[in-house]
């Protein structure tokens, strides 16, 4: 039986994504913020950790709290099982989020994804984060504190909007979603508040479905909006938020410094987005599985839905840019953007014939298929080798570091970094940052820590 180009594309995506995910899960090792949490928990309690975060870091307690819970089973031994399993759970949540987006935008056309619908969405959801210059799969699925702070709030916001669109009346769910969205990170919380505020201001106008969202589920809307504001307020009233704002990087001291930092933030996020390979590959994947629109009304409805996604992405982009202007820019802060722009790009490709009059011949689709598969194989091969190398480096460094700390607690430790070429962005380790080293040393030097290695 001869397979169609669309079917070959879906099968290839599924195989590459599954193998790469297994590699990431089986090569899971602790990284960056994990060390300071493990070090703290080896000497104190989970409640003590939340108190320390409140006083010194900020009021976004649920990301730090959940992250610490993931590590509680690893305080006295090297046990990455729960962290690895959580990676699978996050992949499932992101896949469900994208299924929600596609179900809302595509409607009946979601059947066009065929029998491999779930696997196709899973593949796009998982592979969508891997960058050209940054290990995006790590930031989304293994760097759990970053994921809780930047990816989860946008995922939950999309889920909340979908619940409103179908007229959900579950007030408790709405309020809890709002708390989690608002108490995540300033930029993402601000994005949600702006979206809900626009919805209220335009509640009587059908501007990007504001009237539809509001009228179908008013009580849900008020509950999720209230929860978001409460969660956001908890962040900014904490002593740690202002302590970090003043002492970490510091607020801009002049107009010229503000402008310089603003353009640095803008250029960083913009460059990250346009050089992100899956932003373009998702469009091409959509072209390979494309479907024309039959009626003018369907086209107008589709355009409004895609504009809504774009508007959400632009609001988040602006929030991230302004937020990092007052703080700092880091490579792992873009995960929320990918959660919006990767499905957005796929949808543009899926309806490219109707939206842009882009008609691809069979021979052209074969070329596109070759480009997509080749690009994904190269990206996946690099990521797999990077996962394997970091695991090996981490294990070897751990054996050495246990003995180094026993002999001299202040000795220089070996690290296991995962930096992508170009700008040397990625996972740094105990050999580069003193705060990571201190947490790591406290963790492995704890008298109750169990190590199989003899020095």
Segments (PLM) and residue ranges:
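Transmembrane catalytic cores of multi-pass membrane glycosyltransferases
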Residues: 20-85, 89, 144, 186-318, ...
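Membrane-interface alpha helices of multi-pass inner-membrane proteins
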Residues: 171-195
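Transmembrane alpha-helical segments
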Residues: 90-105, 153-165, 193-201, 285-289, ...
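Intrinsically disordered, polar/acidic, low-complexity terminal segments
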Residues: 4-62, 71-118, 365, 369-455
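Signature aromatic-anchored transmembrane alpha helix within multi-pass, membrane-resident enzymes
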Residues: 170-174, 225, 299-310, 353-382
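Alpha-helical transmembrane segments
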Residues: 7-21, 121-126, 176, 223-229
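Membrane-interface micro-motifs in multi-pass membrane enzymes
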Residues: 114-165, 316-351
């Amino acid at each position: 039986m001869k397979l169609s180009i669309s079917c070959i594309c879906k099968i290839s995506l599924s195989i590459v994504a599954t193998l790469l995910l297994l590699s990431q899960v089986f090569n899971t090792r602790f990284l960056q913020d994990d060390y300071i949490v493990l070090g703290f928990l080896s000497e104190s309690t989970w409640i003590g950790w939340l108190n320390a975060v409140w006083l010194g870091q900020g009021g976004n307690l649920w990301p730090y709290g959940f992250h610490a819970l993931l590590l509680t089973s690893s305080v006295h031994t090297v046990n990455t099982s729960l962290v690895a399993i959580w990676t699978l759970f996050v992949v499932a949540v992101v896949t469900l989020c994208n299924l929600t987006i596609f179900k809302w935008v595509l409607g009946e056309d979601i059947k066009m994804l065929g029998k491999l619908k779930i696997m196709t969405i899973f593949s796009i959801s998982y592979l969508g984060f891997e960058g050209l210059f940054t290990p995006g799969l790590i930031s989304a699925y293994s760097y759990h504190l970053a994921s809780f702070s930047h990816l989860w709030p946008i995922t939950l916001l999309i889920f909340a909007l979908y619940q409103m669109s179908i007229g959900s009346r579950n007030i408790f769910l709405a309020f809890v979603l709002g708390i989690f969205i608002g108490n995540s990170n300033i930029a993402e919380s601000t994005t949600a508040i702006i979206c809900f505020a626009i919805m209220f201001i335009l509640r009587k106008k059908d501007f990007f479905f504001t009237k539809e969202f509001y009228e179908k589920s008013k009580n849900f809307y008020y509950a999720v909006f209230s929860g978001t504001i409460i969660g956001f307020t908890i962040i900014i009233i904490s002593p740690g938020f202002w302590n970090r704002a003043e002492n970490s990087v510091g607020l801009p001291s002049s107009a010229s410094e503000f402008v310089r930092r603003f353009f640095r933030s803008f250029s960083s996020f913009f460059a990250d987005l346009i050089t992100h390979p899956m932003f373009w590959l998702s469009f091409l994947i959509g072209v390979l599985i494309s479907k024309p629109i039959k009626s003018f009304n369907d086209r107008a409805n589709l355009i409004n839905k895609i504009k809504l996604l774009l508007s959400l992405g632009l609001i988040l982009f602006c929030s991230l840019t302004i937020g990092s202007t007052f703080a700092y820019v880091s490579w792992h802060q873009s995960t929320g953007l990918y959660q919006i722009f990767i499905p957005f790009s796929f949808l543009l490709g899926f309806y490219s014939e109707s939206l842009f009059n882009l008609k691809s011949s069979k021979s052209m689709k074969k070329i596109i298929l070759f480009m997509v598969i080749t690009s994904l194989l190269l990206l996946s091969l690099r990521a797999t080798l990077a996962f394997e190398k970091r695991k090996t480096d981490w294990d070897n460094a751990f054996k050495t570091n246990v003995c180094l700390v026993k002999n001299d607690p202040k000795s220089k430790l070996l690290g296991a970094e995962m930096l992508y070429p170009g700008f040397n962005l990625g996972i740094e380790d105990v050999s580069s940052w003193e705060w990571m080293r201190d947490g790591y040393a406290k963790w492995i030097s704890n008298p109750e820590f169990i190590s199989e290695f003899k020095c």
